[in-house]
Regions:
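Flexible, membrane-associating and regulatory peripheral segments of lipid-active enzymes
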Residues: 1-250, 254-268, 290, 323, ...
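A structural motif corresponding to the C-terminal end of an alpha-helix
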Residues: 258-265, 358-371, 447-458
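Conserved beta-strand scaffold positions in the cores of enzyme catalytic domains, especially
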Residues: 230, 266-268, 372-374, 459-461
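C-terminal subdomain of alpha/beta-hydrolase-fold enzymes, centered on the catalytic histidine
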Residues: 401, 413-472
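Alpha/beta-hydrolase-fold serine-hydrolase catalytic core, especially in secreted/extracellular enzymes
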Residues: 2-10, 16, 297, 349, ...
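Serine-dependent carboxylesterase/thioesterase catalytic core
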Residues: 234-238, 269-434
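Short, well-ordered alpha-helical scaffold segments within catalytic/effector domains
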Residues: 251-256, 278-286, 445
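A Trp-anchored, charged/polar loop motif used as the substrate-binding/catalytic surface
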Residues: 198-220, 292, 345-361, 436-451
Length: 472
């Protein structure tokens, strides 16, 4: 594969290329300091091309631009959508679905893509014909920063120092786990159960450790008194306030009912959704729950996989079959596909051990799940994540940018860093622990379909059947 990819386009180049608006540093506080996820120098704009109708006049010129292998493309659409990908990934997608949109030397024919994009499939289909407004080429992470240093150290721990130098971040299961861990560890709240914090008003003056300890005391008291509690479990790349904060603000009457019903015993389970699998999340949640606790669960998106696991019983006989039976990984390169298959085999072996531990802990703790509301869960897998990870994450990032809660929020910056790292490294969705479980071909979907659920749970499911259009 060539180390460069050629963009063939008619556009107006900008002399001093800016960063895309989506990736500019926006902090809520004027004295917030540097962004730990997007530090100075992490992104450098190499080029920006205007392709919209207003730019395709006298100033537009036909040109060819070389994108380096370690650079990222940011493609802005006129409808507000943004795609962050690598030029080589876009080129590979076109080679599979629309080779006529590539030149004789593999160059990407953007003029033809603009005209014919609506008829394409795969990644190119998301660049709806005629809607591309700007294309940026960005140099990403020219030198290691604290996140990369932490990821390499974590990788050494995960491999126990054996051969970690030969493992690349983002192109192996452990390398991707370490990279996602290094990003997620910088989030404001560490994993664990917390007492619900009011969306408005000053935060409690206590550390995460103190807050978790306070929640533990309350949960122990509730279990001893036989009182029910309510636990919220958030979704991918989010937090409890990000997933459920509007419920308290916009549905005040409903929230008052919940507070009365549970006498204020409402809790938030914060967890890592990328570096950890739902099995790891479920074990963390269970570890924080006192034995025999009566609880109700409300989950959103990927959090539904965590909630489902907590509701299982007697699934030991299914654990040995927790492995991928499908040879396809979405990789067009045979060597890359072989690596992904081998990595998945090892990862699923580790997850079988985790499932055995979870089954034992469920039998010991015996949580009493009384009510369970599951919203938009990928219980049988989601093809939104299985087609192309760049598209899925770019769409997620675009959506988060429309939610006021995430404006200037460190969680939003963390998501940007994740999307950029995955794009520049062409990371497979199968190698991201928290996303692999959401793929339709993942053994998680089969386990949740076949495993018995404890009787007596009142369950409500809010679901839909959608097919994405454009980037969203």
């Amino acid at each position: 594969m060539s180390s460069t990819t050629i963009l063939d386009l008619t556009a107006t180049p900008q002399e001093q290329a800016p960063l895309p608006a989506l990736l500019r540093n926006v902090r809520r506080a004027t004295d917030a300091g540097d962004d730990p996820f997007m530090p100075p120098g992490y992104l450098q704009a190499r080029a920006c091309f205007e392709l919209g109708p207003t730019a395709r006049g006298a100033t537009a010129v036909s040109q060819k631009f070389e994108v380096q292998a370690d650079e990222v493309l940011v493609i802005e659409l006129a409808d507000g959508g943004v795609l962050i990908t690598s030029a080589s990934e876009l080129q590979a997608s076109l080679a599979r679905s629309r080779p006529d949109l590539l030149g004789s030397q593999g160059e990407i024919l953007f003029d033809r893509l603009r005209a014919d994009g609506a008829a394409t499939r795969g990644l190119a289909a998301d660049l709806v014909g005629g809607l591309i407004s700007r294309v940026f080429a960005l140099a990403v992470g020219a030198s290691d920063d604290a996140i990369i240093s932490d990821a390499r150290a974590k990788l050494g721990e995960l491999t126990r120092g054996r051969g970690s130098e030969a493992i690349e971040l983002g192109v192996s299961w452990l390398g991707t786990k370490a990279l996602m861990w290094a990003i997620e560890k910088r989030l404001e709240r560490q994993p664990g159960i917390y007492c619900w914090q009011a969306v408005q008003g000053a935060a409690a003056a206590e550390s995460d450790e103190q807050a978790r300890a306070r929640a533990q005391r309350e949960l122990q008291a509730a279990a001893a008194a036989g009182e029910p509690v309510l636990v919220f479990v958030h979704g991918t790349g989010s937090s409890t306030r990000g997933s459920f904060g509007d419920l308290q603000l916009d549905e005040r009457e409903l929230w008052s009912i919940l507070e009365r019903e549970f006498d204020g015993r409402i809790y938030a389970f914060e967890h890592r959704t990328l570096s950890e699998s739902p099995i790891e999340n479920a074990r963390q949640l269970l570890a924080a729950l006192p034995a025999g606790l009566r609880l109700s669960l409300v989950t959103h998106s990927r959090g539904g996989l965590v909630g489902d696991l907590i509701c299982l019983e007697n699934f030991d006989s299914l654990i040995e079959h927790y492995r991928s039976d499908l040879p396809a990984t979405g990789e067009t390169d045979t060597a890359a596909a072989t690596v992904v298959q081998r990595e998945l085999g090892d990862a699923h072996g580790e997850q079988r051990q985790l499932l055995r531990a979870l089954a034992s802990e469920l039998a010991e703790k015996k949580p009493v799940v009384q009510r369970y509301v599951r919203v938009a869960s990928p219980a049988q897998g989601t093809r939104l994540a299985s087609g192309n990870l760049d598209v899925f994450l770019s769409g997620l990032l675009t959506l988060l940018g429309q939610i006021p809660f995430f404006f200037g929020n460190p969680l939003y910056s963390a998501c940007k860093r994740v999307v950029l790292e995955i794009a520049r490294r062409r990371t497979s969705a199968h190698l991201v622990p928290g996303i692999e479980a959401m793929l339709p071909e993942s053994p998680m979907a089969r386990l949740l379909r076949d495993a018995p659920v404890r009787p007596g749970i009142e369950m409500a499911v809010i679901a839909g059947d959608i097919e994405g259009g454009g980037l969203l």
